[in-house]
A protein has these predicted regions:
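Hydrophobic alpha-helical membrane segments
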Residues: 1-197
Length: 197
């Protein structure tokens, strides 16, 4: 850490890197929203068109950006402690306590991040279903909808792990079929949640 702070250039480089990647993740949220729209339409028996991918740019992008900011903040804030710990000298990290602390912190941050992402996972669907809903309302409704259903969605995610491993054997080509299948499954999960609530 001391070498990082003794070299102001590296601090600025890290800040620029995180700022740019944060902005990219927010911008990609608009495309994720369009992708969600495509799979929700498909699950409802409607025919999607290519322009649906850009639906987030047309339909009140400020709400979508606010939700994307929340998702990005969850990701970046939970990765920050692990990142800062990884800046420690290798001698400190490789001793017994350093490695244990690093591993423990990584697991804790991953679990918290996963729980938060599962909690707010239905936000884009809610923004699509309720055009007058604000970003804050969508996040709150998602939290309420996912009470008691996080385990079910986590189980669905786990069922895709073996298929992802098979996709590794195809050098990622299998993902061309797996990713749409996963997204359609999640859209159907949302429709099932709506029926239950």
């Amino acid at each position: 850490i001391t070498s990082l702070f003794l070299n102001p250039g590296s601090v600025i480089e890290y800040i620029i890197y995180f700022a740019v990647s944060f902005l990219i993740s927010i911008f990609s949220g608009l495309f994720s929203y369009g992708e969600t729209y495509i799979y929700l339409k498909t699950s409802c028996g409607q025919q999607p068109v290519l322009s649906d991918l850009f639906y987030g740019f047309k339909q009140t992008p400020d709400r979508i950006i606010r939700v994307a900011v929340v998702f990005s903040l969850i990701s970046y804030l939970l990765n920050l402690p692990v990142f800062l710990l990884s800046l420690l000298p290798q001698e400190t990290l490789l001793n017994g306590y350093g490695m244990l602390l690093f591993s423990l912190l990584t697991v804790v941050c991953a679990v918290i991040g996963m729980l938060l992402m599962l909690t707010y996972s239905q936000s884009y669907y809610l923004l699509l279903d309720f055009p007058d809903c604000s970003a804050r309302e969508a996040l709150r409704k998602s939290r309420d909808m996912m009470k008691g259903s996080k385990g079910r969605l986590f189980y669905i995610d786990l069922t895709f792990v073996p298929l992802m491993l098979l996709c590794v054997l195809t050098c990622g080509i299998g993902l061309l079929w797996l990713m749409p299948y996963m997204q359609a499954t999640k859209a159907n999960f949302y429709l099932d949640l709506v029926k239950q609530n």
